[in-house]
Curated annotation (Swiss-Prot):
The gene is rpsQ. One of the primary rRNA binding proteins, it binds specifically to the 5'-end of 16S ribosomal RNA. It comes from Streptomyces avermitilis (strain ATCC 31267 / DSM 46492 / JCM 5070 / NBRC 14893 / NCIMB 12804 / NRRL 8165 / MA-4680). The lineage of its organism: Bacteria, Bacillati, Actinomycetota, Actinomycetes, Kitasatosporales. GO terms for biological process: translation. This is Small ribosomal subunit protein uS17. Keywords: Ribonucleoprotein, Ribosomal protein, RNA-binding, rRNA-binding.
Amino acid sequence: MSESNVTETNEQRGFRKTREGLVVSDKMDKTVVVAVEDRVKHALYGKVIRRTNKLKAHDEQNAAGVGDRVLLMETRPLSATKRWRVVEILEKAK
């Protein structure tokens, strides 16, 4: 038996993006809306601009609440607008 006949069982997944953001809504079942802030420097004037993007993320246990800081990871499309999932809750709201 040669090594070439053995199939590769542990295939590598592609690189998945991670984002950190603040939960702004948890009213949907197993879904949270997370505001992810991006700071961009203006090309001409050099001023730092804050850009916010709202992402819908899958939260299987409904553990995240409004005001929590969460870590998101990119995943396959789970619905029409949901392409992220909550990996962990970094900080609970006070």
